[in-house]
């Protein structure tokens, strides 16, 4: 239970990422100064939790000192590729809180194997803007399963968070808001309905984001009608993400940044580059500034001035996706019915 009486409770998955950190600080900036806030930081490991809490505290002191005594921190250790870990996170939230106001589904995972450098050079030479907007040279492993025998990327990015929401719906009921972070690269071409767990897909990350889009359109009306929960779909555009740095050296990193700025200069609205600008749409959605029946993107002008873009999504197949997820949910309810674990164990 929060020590701050009647505080606003926000759970941000993947808080230790660049986007997760910026969602946290922008949410704190966007909420009224008289609001007491409990920020529930999540990560897979305790060191990352400690690091991001320290970083957020430093930001509060330097940028929003009016919030210094208004913010309390809590944490969850949760791995969305592990159903027992998800169940454990549910138990902990259920013990500590009566209501959750904001839930950001930002945790995302890919199974990258590196970069096709020959393909990357050719793409950049042929179409530099397309090469840094919809790249095809990121190599992804095919057929990777989790320990639960589910498609790993499917479980991490789609089913794991979906099951988590299923478990904590009663905490979000009557006013809670869910914000799903999708991607610019979530075209229908990345998903086969014969491979919903993405085990045969060479673009499983993008396919998982297409599934997120379809899941949203198949569930947001029911969530609001039956539970009073508002769900939103957003994407952060293109920004510098920590997850891919391991494949870049100093030259390729700055080369990438140069192409990002070039794309923005030539008119791309999606090359936000800054994680802070990328977090605009997620936080705007949480604060009720976007619509539920579209996908809202973080965007910016050539000079870096931020704004929001509304995008229409082809929702064909959304009912089939939700039906599949609900069937899996029932199966895992049965498998986990006698399982009790401790999320505080690092």
From Swiss-Prot:
Recorded catalytic activity of this chain's protein: 3-dehydro-4alpha-methylzymosterol + NADPH + H(+) = 4alpha-methylzymosterol + NADP(+)
Stored Pfam families: adh_short
Intracellular or extracellular location(s): Endoplasmic reticulum membrane; Lipid droplet
Catalytic residue positions: 182, 205, 209
One CC-aspect GO term: endoplasmic reticulum membrane
Residues reported in the UniProt entry to bind NADP(+): 19, 42, 48, 205, 209, 241
Signal peptide: none
Induction profile: Expression is increased by itraconazole (which targets the lanosterol demethylase CYP51/ERG11) and by zaragozic acid A (which targets the squalene synthase ERG9).
Enzyme Commission no: 1.1.1.270
Group of enzyme by EC: oxidoreductase
Keywords, in A-Z order: Endoplasmic reticulum, Glycoprotein, Lipid biosynthesis, Lipid droplet, Lipid metabolism, Membrane, NADP, Oxidoreductase, Steroid biosynthesis, Transmembrane, Transmembrane helix
SUPFAM superfamilies hit by this protein: NAD(P)-binding Rossmann-fold domains
Pathway per the UniProt entry: Steroid biosynthesis; zymosterol biosynthesis; zymosterol from lanosterol: step 5/6
GO molecular function, a single term: 3-beta-hydroxysteroid 3-dehydrogenase (NADP+) activity
Disulfide linkage: none
Gene deletion effect: Leads to complete loss of both 3-keto reductase and oxidosqualene cyclase (performed by ERG7) activities, compromising all sterol synthesis.
Keyword Aminoacyl-tRNA synthetase: no
Membrane-spanning segments: 242-262
Gene Ontology annotations of biological process type: ergosterol biosynthetic process
UniProt family annotation: Belongs to the short-chain dehydrogenases/reductases (SDR) family. ERG27 subfamily.
Subunit-level organization: Heterotetramer of ERG25, ERG26, ERG27 and ERG28. ERG28 acts as a scaffold to tether ERG27 and other 4,4-demethylation-related enzymes, forming a demethylation enzyme complex, in the endoplasmic reticulum. Interacts with ERG25 and ERG28. Also interacts with ERG7, but only in lipid particles.
Protein name, entry field: 3-keto-steroid reductase ERG27
Gene this chain is encoded by: ERG27
